[in-house]
Regions:
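Active-site microenvironments in enzyme catalytic cores
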Residues: 2-106
């Protein structure tokens, strides 16, 4: 992916987050997307979140189970960031319908 496409995709993801709308999977529109592209998009997406005041408070790792990796067609875990806007305090409650799009648990 070229830099413009990476920036455009990150902006689209950021807009969909703010508007709480579902978008077509990136792999459907960009079948050539690879892990390098994904991490570049993630870094740009984080920059957009930081530009509106979010702060990085941690890192995350996902897709650690071989069963989940097989289900998703990948062969390694993925790594990402956590911002203060993603924080949910212990024992607090929130509405899944109002907060999450296609929630999943590993």
């Amino acid at each position: 992916m070229n830099l413009q496409t990476i920036n455009d995709v990150a902006s689209e993801l950021f807009d969909s987050l703010k508007q709480q709308k579902i978008i077509q999977p990136l792999t459907d529109r960009y079948p050539e997307i690879d892990i390098k592209d994904a991490y570049q998009i993630s870094r740009q997406f984080l920059s957009l979140r930081e530009a509106v005041g979010e702060k990085v408070i941690g890192k995350k790792i996902g897709v650690t189970s071989s069963v989940v990796q097989e289900m998703l067609g990948v062969d390694q875990p993925d790594f990402g960031f956590l911002t203060d806007a993603m924080r949910v305090q212990n024992r607090s409650t929130f509405s899944i319908e109002d907060s999450l799009i296609q929630p999943r648990a590993e």
